[in-house]
């Protein structure tokens, strides 16, 4: 595990329908993340937060697209710099649209080393594009974008994007996926472990299979963790909550086994909304899950 970490916050909520998730990075930091990571022996560099444009162009099918593109371009540059210095980029959102920038940067950096795989833990598929979306919210498009099936503007920053191979992509904990979106995911060939399959197989089996798929002939894995994957009773502070999600223990098992694989190259933690939270319960959980993904074990 890389012992040098760059923590990059992104104060972004223009990709979502509800405001407040822009304060997610502050909530996760307030939960003690930086000191706890230092206590684990990491060399932690807090790179501050990326700020979005306050105004920008929009459309019915890609709401606030100018702000989304601008933020992702800035994040792409920051993650690229982090990787060039040999550090682990840890990105704190912010809504999930920011994953387009972080994943694009990591994929580009490892393009000549086999590329990367992606494990996407989320209640939603995020596999829409401007033609399939029902809402126009761009936090529902980044997974498809980084694989070349979504809006190219989310990942094209003046050079050819390094798209992720769908054979190395896994979606876990989905339980609110649009019919068109589900059809597109099936056609693309992405591996999906919906919540009912986790119930049937158990999280250890699911995450081990996900690691095998994402790391097959790749340099390693990017983890994109949307806190709405966790059941709202445990993580109430998120804007698109869906009931009957992952338990806290299932969530920790997933990230602990990923840490033990020594395949993790980079990570996003997104969609923590402190406005909707209860005494920073969700921010604290997000911080603890990050620590477990980086090697801490919850007994």
Range-by-range predicted roles:
Residues 1, 110-113, 136, 158-165, ...:
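Solvent-exposed alpha-helices and their adjacent loops that cap or buttress functional pockets
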Residues 2-12, 18-90, 102, 108-113, ...:
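Catalytic cores of soluble, metal-dependent hydrolases
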Residues 12, 95-96, 123, 174-175, ...:
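Active-site metal-binding loops of divalent metal-dependent hydrolases
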Residues 88-157, 261:
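Active-site histidine-anchored catalytic micro-motif
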Residues 120-123, 147, 168, 173-176, ...:
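Short, structured patches in soluble enzyme cores that scaffold and shape functional sites
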Residues 123, 127, 139-142, 165, ...:
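Internal, well-ordered alpha-helical segments in soluble enzyme and binding-protein domains
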Residues 128, 177-179, 274-276:
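Active-site environment of divalent metal-dependent phosphoester hydrolases
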Residues 155-182:
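Phosphate/diphosphate-binding glycine-rich loops and adjacent basic-rich segments that engage nucleotide
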């Amino acid at each position: 595990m890389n012992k040098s970490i760059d923590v990059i916050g992104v104060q972004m909520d223009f990709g979502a329908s509800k405001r407040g998730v822009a304060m997610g990075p502050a909530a996760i930091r307030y939960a003690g993340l930086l000191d706890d990571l230092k206590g684990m022996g990491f060399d932690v560099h807090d790179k501050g937060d990326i700020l979005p444009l306050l105004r920008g162009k929009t459309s019915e099918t890609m709401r606030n697209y100018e702000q989304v593109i601008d933020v992702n371009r800035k994040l792409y540059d920051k993650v690229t710099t982090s990787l060039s210095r040999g550090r682990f980029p840890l990105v704190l959102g912010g809504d999930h649209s920011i994953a387009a920038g972080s994943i694009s940067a990591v994929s580009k950096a490892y393009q000549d080393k086999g590329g990367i795989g992606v494990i996407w833990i989320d209640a939603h598929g995020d596999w829409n594009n401007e033609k399939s979306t029902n809402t126009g919210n761009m936090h529902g498009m980044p997974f498809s974008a980084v694989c070349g099936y979504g809006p190219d503007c989310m990942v094209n920053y003046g050079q050819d994007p390094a798209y992720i191979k769908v054979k190395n992509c896994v979606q876990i904990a989905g339980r609110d996926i649009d019919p068109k979106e589900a059809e597109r995911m099936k056609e693309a060939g992405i591996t999906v472990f919906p919540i009912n399959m986790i119930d049937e197989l158990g999280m250890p089996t699911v995450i081990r299979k996900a690691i095998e798929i994402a790391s097959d002939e790749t340099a390693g894995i990017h983890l994109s963790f949307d806190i709405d994957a966790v059941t709202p009773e445990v993580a109430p502070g998120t804007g698109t909550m869906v009931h009957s999600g992952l338990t806290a223990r299932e969530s920790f098992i997933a990230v602990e086994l990923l840490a033990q694989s020594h395949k993790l190259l980079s990570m996003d933690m997104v969609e923590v909304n402190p406005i909707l939270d209860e005494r920073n319960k969700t921010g604290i959980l997000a911080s603890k899950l990050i620590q477990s993904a980086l090697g801490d074990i919850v007994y």
